Amino acid sequence: MKTLIRKFSRTAITVVLVILAFIAIFNAWVYYTESPWTRDARFSADVVAIAPDVSGLITQVNVHDNQLVKKGQILFTIDQPRYQKALEEAQADVAYYQVLAQEKRQEAGRRNRLGVQAMSREEIDQANNVLQTVLHQLAKAQATRDLAKLDLERTVIRAPADGWVTNLNVYTGEFITRGSTAVALVKQNSFYVLAYMEETKLEGVRPGYRAEITPLGSNKVLKGTVDSVAAGVTNASSTRDDKGMATIDSDLEWVRLAQRVPVRIRLDNQQENIWPAGTTATVVVTGKQDRDESQDSFFRKMAHRLREFG
């Protein structure tokens, strides 16, 4: 009898342990797959692609790669002597047409005062037409001078905002063309996180919800707020034919992979460039309030740690 009871007890304990293990694994799976979190998140920032508005030789580079610069600080300079000469030439043209316009104005005024009693109407009209032509040439010369002045000012390339110079690829003596990107500027205090959430987890993601960000390789947890959720993503299976009609790919996979939707998260505290733009992180959306770690069960703490390993 005792042997039977002992065997029954062992069987019951085994069944209970199996059931508990199954429940734990099931809860872990649900928590892992349905809670709003992702390992596919990246730090991002506002980046300004700096390109000159004039072409010429680079005569001076005032910064080095990865340097923190202030708004208005000179980054590099382009061939100022050439543009200075162009401005002087334009100023000389303006001075010439100003004198010429004054002469033609006096001549036209004299002929208009004398009238048709002293000369023909054709001569009077000709003087007025010459004056108008010279005035137009003067206006054109003034516009050319203003453009030359603007070009001279733009030979000095300045930082449009506070930030870090990155990917600097200009050197003294190189020729740079107008519009070609010379350097990228990562704006200071503009860092945020883009979390690519699976569509199955968007139910728990709303603007204003709190989020935890753990940079890859770090135990530090940053706090943030969901700023916005992307309004749409590209549909790779839909295209257009030459008449504009929609063409849908007929392939339907047995296992459908969830689309990933970008979620923008605003950081509570800017971290400067400790985690550069493009580096990865794990993001957990905790809901309307921050997670109270002191009330987390051992299971939840383990689940949070397991997220770091995928």
Swiss-Prot record:
What is the protein's membrane topology class?
A: Single-pass membrane protein
Answer whether the UniProt record assigns the keyword Membrane to this protein. yes
Residue ranges annotated as transmembrane are 12-32
Protein location: Cell inner membrane
Q: Which Pfam families match?
A: CusB_dom_1, HlyD_D23
InterPro entries assigned to the protein according to its UniProt record, in alphabetical order: CusB-like_dom_1 (IPR043602), CusB_D23 (IPR032317), MFP_Efflux_Pump (IPR050393), PHBA_efflux_pump_AaeA (IPR022871), RND_pump_MFP (IPR006143)
Keywords, ordered alphabetically: Cell inner membrane, Cell membrane, Membrane, Transmembrane, Transmembrane helix, Transport
Q: Does the keyword Transmembrane apply?
A: yes
- What does the sequence similarity comment in the record state about its family? Belongs to the membrane fusion protein (MFP) (TC 8.A.1) family.
Give the protein's function.
Forms an efflux pump with AaeB.
Question: What protein am I looking at?
Answer: p-hydroxybenzoic acid efflux pump subunit AaeA
Source species: Shigella flexneri
